[in-house]
From Swiss-Prot:
Principal location class: secreted
Record bears the keyword Ubl conjugation: no
PANTHER family, sorted: GB|AAF24581.1 (PTHR33993:SF14), GLYOXALASE-RELATED (PTHR33993)
Matches recorded under PROSITE patterns: VOC
Organism (species): Mycobacterium tuberculosis (strain ATCC 25618 / H37Rv)
Ranges for region Glyoxalase 1: 13-123
Protein name: Putative glyoxylase CFP32
Subcellular location: Secreted
Length: 261
């Protein structure tokens, strides 16, 4: 279902980048994914929110760092989860062990949002759609294809997401003593969860974009001033992926999906 007109509660439906150099970041992602941009003024004089588009569809956004951000705060790709009633979900966050970073507020007529952290410290946005449903094109080259919660306490985190947004999960062993949890909104598989692959990685929601060639995209990212954090590698039955960073230091992954059987 590449084109989307709605999202079930619990489904990651949007990603945006907060960066220290918005202009440079836009050029980098255009070189990688072919994105264009629609710039929308941020209320309160906070610059512009650059809506990334592909084939006329909204696929992501690139924004400046938020006002009052701590000095040295690294650029980051944020994940947002669709909710039916953001205020009702926010009311469950603190009792569930999380924290409310930004109380619910309206973004004009686009929607209503909040930003929270789960009990393991991973930050995530909550989005109640109005005019803006989130990404209207996914799972195609240059668009969002997967969102993955990396946390050192997966059981604690997943109990929280089940309580606040109704996400369930199934589990599979991917290596000796290492499980991968597939997140589900109803019967649909909408994301993943695993422990960080290396020491020192903070708990966070990680973003994957679809590409035609993971190796070529990694090389292109490096040539454009980014870095290859993890060299391209195969995931059996899933595809070939690489972990990259943009020139400002925001980390993301690219995935060439395996052919569908």
């Amino acid at each position: 279902m590449p084109k989307r007109s709605e999202y079930r509660q619990g489904t990651p439906n949007w990603v945006d980048l907060q960066t220290t150099d918005q202009s440079a970041a836009k050029k980098f992602y255009t070189s990688l994914f072919g994105w264009g941009y629609d710039d929308n003024p941020v209320p309160g004089g906070g610059g512009v929110y650059s809506m990334a588009t592909l084939n006329g569809e909204a696929v992501a956004a690139i924004a400046p760092m938020p006002p009052g951000a701590p000095e040295g705060m690294p650029p980051i790709w944020n994940t947002y989860i669709a909710v039916d009633d953001v205020d009702a979900v926010v009311d469950k966050v603190v009792p569930g062990g999380g924290q409310v970073m930004m109380p619910a507020f309206d973004i004009g007529d686009a929607g209503r949002m909040s930003f929270i952290t789960d009990p393991t410290g991973a930050a995530v946005g909550l989005w109640q759609a109005n005019r803006h449903i989130g990404a209207t094109l996914v799972n195609e080259t240059g668009t969002l294809i997967w969102n993955e919660l990396l946390t050192d306490k997966p059981d604690l985190a997943l109990a929280f997401y089940e309580a606040v947004v109704g996400l369930t999960h199934s589990s599979m062993e991917i290596a000796a003593g290492q499980n991968y949890r597939v997140l589900k909104a109803g019967d649909a598989e909408v994301g993943g969860c695993m422990e960080p692959p290396m020491p020192g990685v903070p708990n966070h929601w990680h973003v994957y974009f679809a590409v035609d060639d993971a190796d070529a995209t990694a090389a292109k990212a490096a040539a454009a001033g980014g870095q290859v954090i993890a060299e391209p590698a195969d995931i059996p039955s899933v595809g070939r992926f690489a972990v990259l960073s943009d020139p400002q230091g925001a980390i993301f992954s690219v995935l060439k999906p395996a052919p569908q059987q």
